[in-house]
Amino acid sequence: CYFMYSFANTGKILEAYTEYRFLPQLTARIGQFKTMYTIENPMSPCFVELINCYSQAVNYLAGINGSDPLYGSNSGRDMGILIYGDLFKKKLSYNLAVMNGQGINLKDKNNQKDIVGSLMVHPLDWLSVGGSFVKGKGCAVAASSVNPDIAIGDSYTRNRWSAGATIQTKPVSLRTEYLAGKDGHVKSDGYLSLIHISEPTRH
């Protein structure tokens, strides 16, 4: 079992879930946890390179900081059930989930579920390539000036997808992604690329 609570502002539960490993290649998780959309969103803030943590595109499309008013501020998390694992001697990693699509600490307001999936291929020890998607129906928690046709409480199409790659070597690491979404009839997209250079350790 895992539990994470934030004491900031009024305080709230961020994560609460339990897991069971059926096979070395298959683990199931149920509860409230990070949505497996994009490479960046599931990452801990401790490992994200940016000063303000997550990138602008991921903040918006993954529903992290409230920059998408329709979805609200949900720290990139949701409630649901997830299966995940590694296949083919860890050359392929997969995640597949059924989520409420309403964010954290809220019951499903439209009885519609989101299907979330991601797939990463690791052809080389230092290279990973893959993508992810969210297909579902949102229920607007606030009005948005960029999407005025959707009112508070309306159900709307909320789809997302992404494609990206990571390169990990001792001196240099690279993470790059293209992500896009559609809320109702309004489309949005973004691109990010980060390079991290490590200085060799001197003894």
Regions found by a protein language model. Name each.
Residues H122-L194, S198, R202:
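Detector for outer-membrane/organellar transmembrane beta-barrel domains
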Residues I39-P42, C53, Y94, N105-K107, ...:
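Outer-membrane beta-barrel proteins
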